[in-house]
């Protein structure tokens, strides 16, 4: 059994193994607190994310299990990687990942980005998306604060807690409004990997302009702002709307013409706008894919088809429709953690695996 130390950070108890020292708070999310720390075993800086009460409800247990499975499966230079995971004596779960110095949200609020940085950041976002999409995974909550950057401008996508299987009948969810694809608001249940490309397009526009492109106050205002730039949705999109209330709302909006992107983004590179227009398309069926976007001339300085890998195998989503009690999720989680550490059930684990109360 590993030794643990208990700390209070922002009024939250952090229980970590003695391997990690010098903890400092770096961020607080809806589902956990993140601290930086020094890993004495590897002499590197790491980020430690505490999952708050992972076994409090079946929904939260499943969400935590999903994120753990994804982090174990996804191995790519532009996706955050898991270096350690452990369960504390209080049965909280801690994910340990590499530490990057900042995120895109902080960069965008501090200063305008130069052209070469915009290109390089967009290239890396799309390179990461190509990989996860090839594994049958949709991130679903891509936004600047979920895109980490280090001092070398290396970029990694993080926070896969909302990620889901690529499925044409996806269930509705709550993501960050500014970056939400219109098909989520219009059809709610029918969307796929194209939603991430829309989000990446919104982030691309924000890098070009230095401010959010579609800062809606609520979902109605959000959709209205989108139509101010893209015009009224085409008939092919309106036909996909299942909800009568949504259909009435869309039909009640004034008819709007598309605004030329060169008029909206007066100082932008024409090649950048050509790619942006292909990413911000109302109809997800005609929206450019991440793989196609990588080959666009705007990204030619970085594009290398021999170094833009796809996943070797699709992610196993067989657990995703399971409606299981907390104790079952707990056992499954312990099994995944043991597997991560390459320890079988008869071995001696370095971290605690508390008994499950049946």
UniProtKB/Swiss-Prot annotation:
GO terms for molecular function: ATP binding; MAP kinase activity; protein serine kinase activity; protein serine/threonine kinase activity. Residues 20-299 form the Protein kinase domain. Belongs to the protein kinase superfamily. Ser/Thr protein kinase family. MAP kinase subfamily. HOG1 sub-subfamily. The active site is at residue 141. The gene is HOG1. A motif (TXY) lies at residues 171-173. One of its GO terms (biological process) is cellular response to oxidative stress. It catalyses: L-seryl-[protein] + ATP = O-phospho-L-seryl-[protein] + ADP + H(+); L-threonyl-[protein] + ATP = O-phospho-L-threonyl-[protein] + ADP + H(+). The modification Phosphotyrosine is found at residue 173. The keyword Cytoplasm applies. Its EC number is 2.7.11.24. The keyword Cytoplasm applies. It comes from the Eukaryota. This is Mitogen-activated protein kinase HOG1. Proline-directed serine/threonine-protein kinase involved in a signal transduction pathway that is activated by changes in the osmolarity of the extracellular environment. Controls osmotic regulation of transcription of target genes. The TXY motif contains the threonine and tyrosine residues whose phosphorylation activates the MAP kinases. Its cofactor is Mg(2+). It comes from Mycosarcoma maydis. The lineage of its organism: Eukaryota, Fungi, Dikarya, Basidiomycota, Ustilaginomycotina. It is found in: Cytoplasm; Nucleus. The modification Phosphothreonine is found at residue 171. It is an enzyme of class 2 (transferase).
